[in-house]
Amino acid sequence: MATEQTPLLKVNNIEVIYEHVILVLKGVSLNVYEGQIASLLGANGAGKSTTLKAISNLVKAERGEVTKGTVEFDGIRVDRLFAPQLVKMGLIQIMEGRHTFEHLTVEDDLLTGAYTRGRDKKGTKAALEMVYGYFPRLRERRSAKTGYISGGEMQMCAIGRGLMAKPKIMLLDEPSMGLAPLLVEEIFNIIRRLNKEEHVGMLLAEQNAAMALKYAEYGYVMENGRVVLDGDAATLADNADVKEFYLGLTAVGKKSYRDVKHYHRRKRWLA
């Protein structure tokens, strides 16, 4: 059982190998505490998605394997469990790419997330109303096929489906990807509300570092399959390397293509 002192999610020095030969994660460690929003920052290919899949054990579906280290959730070692077992424990991953069941209506898509509730019709109905409370747009679109709704509505549907399973923690992979700035702000505001009001922990894998650090309490910067920097969000947002390489800022403010440098200051963690 997690407490304020012990993490709800503890990733300890994990290594992930694909196809028995491709080393993707190299000693990744991180903690997420109960009710915390933490973020994984990094460029495409840094290892963020693989880290989430290693935690949720979806990496096995892609011929990957956690070959070293451990993953603990709510005080239990889970890296040898199957993904459905983790869902029943309250660890839910929202995949990159806004996956929905295109042939189902929005409401039926949401209800697929309630399978762990079994025959608890009352609880399922209450959960559905809770989801509609956070995403009123989904209530309006409840009868529409998910294959014909907007990208923002698909993302809302994917998060809502995860909420139906009574999560203790949600792993969100690139929730801002492909969305207009106003929709990104709306999605992140709802993520914050879910965290505060429903006490759902969040681990966000996000290339949009500015948005992630705005809403997260703690962050981890990944590069080439390793965590190279971590700290509370405010400290990371003020870090010179994070500013230049992930926020697009320099000592004189935002970068302009007119003033683009023909060199980069070497990252301190590569020195």
Residue ranges of model-derived segments:
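Glycine-rich phosphate-binding loops of nucleotide-dependent enzymes
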Residues: 2-271
